UniProtKB/Swiss-Prot annotation:
Protein localization: Mitochondrion inner membrane
Source organism (scientific name): Homo sapiens (Human)
Bilayer disposition of the protein: Single-pass membrane protein
Record's protein name: MICOS complex subunit MIC13
GO biological process: cristae formation; inner mitochondrial membrane organization
Amino acid sequence: MVARVWSLMRFLIKGSVAGGAVYLVYDQELLGPSDKSQAALQKAGEVVPPAMYQFSQYVCQQTGLQIPQLPAPPKIYFPIRDSWNAGIMTVMSALSVAPSKAREYSKEGWEYVKARTK
């Protein structure tokens, strides 16, 4: 009984995380135009490092541990607009071709089975 409840809880937690991720992507319009994706990435780049620093300071205060100061991350310019939409297009293209490819492969497999059974 406990194993079933635990597996159900794991499923619900994973589903909640996945649903939250899908909602966040939809809410932030990350699958839309590239400029919005680029703006979201820049916004995350500005917000995450200070938040991580504040969290590490909080952990130091609460636990008494001394976390060594890490060097600042290098500033790297990566034009995400060039690769983000290319990745999305590749995935969507593969998904749109999948049914016809599955039909072709199953037809080839059926022909192979028919040839072997004769």
